[in-house]
Amino acid sequence: MRPSGRNNDQLRNLKVTHNFTKHAEGSVLIEFGDTKVICTASVVAGVPKFKKDSGEGWLTAEYGMLPRSTHTRMDREAARGKQSGRTQEIQRLIGRALRASVDLTAIGENTIKVDCDVIQADGGTRTASITGASLAIADAIEYMKQNGMLDEQANPLLSQVAAISVGIYNNEPVLDLDYDEDSNAETDMNVVMNSNGGIIEIQGTAEGKDFSEEEFAKMLGLAKKGIKEIFATVF
C-alpha cells in the first residue's frame, strides 16, 4: 500500500494554471498533488556569444526552490554564494529536455529563458518543472506570433514535452512518487518523453538495491502510461 493510498499506476491530482504571472511571455503554475512549481518562459532579444550570427536562437533554463518549499527551511543559494550540484544538474536536465522540443532556427536570434521556481516540494519537482516549462514555452511562442516577433505561420514547436518519476517502492513499481515514497524508494527513475511518443531522457538510480531488466521495463511502461495521461490532461 502506498502512503497516499493511490494505485501503483495512479498519478497525483494534476492541475495547470496558465498566465499565472503578469509579465512573462509564458507562465504556468503546475501542481502534481502537493508539489507546486511556477514555470515562466521569457523572450529576450539576442543570443549567447557562441550563437552569434548563427541565425539560430537559444533556450536555457534555471531552477530554484523557495526556502520554505521543503519541510524545514533551507537557505537561499544566492545567500550561500553558489548553486548546489543538484541544482546545476536539474537545470541542465530541464534545458536539454526543452531544447529537444524547439526548432531554434525558427525563433531567430532570440533567447527563451525558462525559470522554474518550486514553491512547495513533495517529490517530483524536476519532472513537474519540465512539464510546466513546456506549457509555458508554448504560450511564449504564441505571444511571439501575436506580437510580430515571429511569422504567424512559423512553427518552432517540434513537440510538447512531459516528464514523470517512477520507482520501486516496497518491492513494487510505482508511478509519480511523492516525497514519502521517493525518500524510501529502492529505485528512483525520471523519464522525459515528447508528444510524438519519443523518449528524450531517462535517469535511473538504484538506492542501495539493484533493479532487474524486468523491473526497468515495468517502470518504463508505467512512465509511458503516466506521460500519456499528462498529455491528454493538460496539453
UniProtKB/Swiss-Prot annotation:
Q: What is its EC number?
A: 2.7.7.56
> What PROSITE patterns does the entry give?
RIBONUCLEASE_PH
Known Gene3D superfamilies for this protein?
GHMP Kinase, N-terminal domain (3.30.230.70)
Sequence positions that bind phosphate: R86, G124, T125, R126
> One MF term in GO for this entry?
tRNA binding
Xref: Pfam families: RNase_PH, RNase_PH_C
Its domain of life reads Bacteria
Among SUPFAM superfamilies, the record links this protein to:
Ribonuclease PH domain 2-like, Ribosomal protein S5 domain 2-like
Q: Name one GO biological process term.
A: rRNA catabolic process
Keywords for this protein: Nucleotidyltransferase, RNA-binding, rRNA processing, Transferase, tRNA processing, tRNA-binding
Reaction catalysed?
A: tRNA(n+1) + phosphate = tRNA(n) + a ribonucleoside 5'-diphosphate
Q: Which InterPro entries does the record associate with it?
A: ExoRNase_PH_dom1 (IPR001247), ExoRNase_PH_dom2 (IPR015847), ExoRNase_PH_dom2_sf (IPR036345), PNPase/RNase_PH_dom_sf (IPR027408), Ribosomal_Su5_D2-typ_SF (IPR020568), RNase_PH (IPR050080), RNase_PH_bac-type (IPR002381), RNase_PH_CS (IPR018336)
The UniProt similarity line reads:
Belongs to the RNase PH family.
Q: How the protein assembles, per its UniProt entry?
A: Homohexameric ring arranged as a trimer of dimers.
Task performed by this protein: Phosphorolytic 3'-5' exoribonuclease that plays an important role in tRNA 3'-end maturation. Removes nucleotide residues following the 3'-CCA terminus of tRNAs; can also add nucleotides to the ends of RNA molecules by using nucleoside diphosphates as substrates, but this may not be physiologically important. Probably plays a role in initiation of 16S rRNA degradation (leading to ribosome degradation) during starvation.
Protein name listed in UniProt: Ribonuclease PH
Gene that specifies this protein: rph
